[in-house]
Amino acid sequence: MAKEIKYDMKARELMLAGVNALADAVAVTHGPKGRNVVIDKAWGAPTVTKDGVTVAKEIELENKFENMGAQMVKEVASKTSDTAGDGTTTATVLARAIYEEGMKLVVAGNNPMAIKRGIDKACEAAVKSLMNLSKPTKEQREIAQVGTISANTDETIGNIIAEAMNKVGKEGVITVEEAKSMDTTLDVVEGMQFDRGYISPYFVTDSEKMVCSLEDPYILIHEKKISNMKDLLPLLEQTAKMGKPLLIVAEDVEGEALATLVVNRLRGTLQIAAVKAPGFGDRRKAMLEDIAILTGGTVVSEDMGIKLENMSLADLGKCKRVSIDKDNTTIVDGAGARSALEGRVKQIRAQIDDTTSDYDREKLQERLAKLIGGVAVINVGAATEVEMKEKKARVEDALNATRAAVEEGIVPGGGVALVRAIDAVAKAKITGEQKIGARVVMRALEAPLRMIANNAGMEGSVVLDKVKNTEGSFGYNADTDTYEDLIEAGVIDPTKVVRLALQNACSIAGLMLTTEAMIADKPDENAGGMPAMPGGGMGGMGGMGGMM
């Protein structure tokens, strides 16, 4: 197919048009007074959201060159969402500001490569400033405040997340589910999560979320590969008779065995799923033993002389529910004996005390958290399904933000931390033409605060000027329309979220500024619609009246 090529100024202008189209749609959601965006769906009710990455992911532009610009900024939002779980709107606003400011300088004849290097150095200086401004989260109150801000100033969500973290520990597993009632509640269930997803996507029970859920399943725990169906068949027949689902945890399930399981799952003969065993080597054996003790099962192990063909239902583990996605498996409410579980916990604690290796200690603590930490389930309630989906997305964002805050600490919110980084960039040792790139970042660091103020109905430049003339965590609280100490007021952002938003924005904007040519498929001008059916289409169907 023929290609169309755009060069230099024309290419950058088209890219900027795409960047602006996406950033304008995302930026309206920024801050506590940000607006909602309604997204049409091919089926079902429209989605109402205030989440930047959800808006960004829906945007596809007709012009291929403009679309390239939009897709590159979409990458900023997606990457920030994947690594920090929040801050997608901030990242988008920053990326647009850096590209827009940089474009003016490139048009004026400055070297794009020098500008990019200046942007990279300024980004480093700004990140150092954020780290210096950062404070660790010490209290449950601070965790609740981070959750509240991320959930669009919803205190209920912030408090529930803080309570969940308090109950299962900061390293514990917290999941978000839809409630049957209008109330948002917290349940803490004993369980275990490990980082292995389903072996085949055909095991999925919810194709929209790509999740496999099994209720009251039997669990077969095998330390080797399963490739032969013959040994597995008696167990499958027994579980099918009982009408119960079966989860297989093994080193791998492949060949004939996997094909048979998938075919039976698709036909509806068996409710089944298979996941790879977590860990490697001796650690895998230990983790499989942990799962066996938690669920009251027996590990199929050659070392112990236990063979698959000799296994009966009594040797299988049991639990209340298993949830599997492409990356993780969560076993909830295992049926193992309490005394056996306590003995295992005691044993792992003794190993932690005895070990001299930091790596081994870390892995043992992970296992301990999985055995005793349990799983906290936040049940999100709302009056309608549309509100439920929107609220659930906010809870997930808030949960990611609080985890990030626990990891790297907190900085003042409301765009103030980025404004405070401007001085650090100005003082950084950046010379020559690269200084122009640093000025681009200094100007862009103002953009999130301007946007928050604009969305709150204030004049961004006036608010920015007032904040610049103060120090530390003093800034503008858009929710209450006051100037105050934002950390005291509970307007805080996780350092990790702000840092990654800035780093991702600088990375992609720098790439776009150094773009000199763009190539896309040429639109086919001869491609028309489908030809009309002869004889006026379906007029001949009138004869079907006689069939009534």
UniProtKB/Swiss-Prot annotation:
Looking up Gene3D superfamilies in the UniProt record yields: GroEL (3.50.7.10), GroEL-like equatorial domain (1.10.560.10), TCP-1-like chaperonin intermediate domain (3.30.260.10)
Q: Where in the cell is it found?
A: Cytoplasm
Which residues are connected by disulfide bridges in this protein?
Answer: none
Catalysis: reaction(s): ATP + H2O + a folded polypeptide = ADP + phosphate + an unfolded polypeptide
Going by the UniProt record, its keywords in alphabetical order are: ATP-binding, Chaperone, Cytoplasm, Isomerase, Nucleotide-binding
- EC number(s) of the enzyme? 5.6.1.7
Q: Could you say which residues bind ATP here?
A: 29-32, 50, 86-90, 414, 493
Family classification: Belongs to the chaperonin (HSP60) family.
Q: How does it assemble?
A: Forms a cylinder of 14 subunits composed of two heptameric rings stacked back-to-back. Interacts with the co-chaperonin GroES.
Function, as annotated, reads: Together with its co-chaperonin GroES, plays an essential role in assisting protein folding. The GroEL-GroES system forms a nano-cage that allows encapsulation of the non-native substrate proteins and provides a physical environment optimized to promote and accelerate protein folding.
Q: What protein is this chain from?
A: Chaperonin GroEL
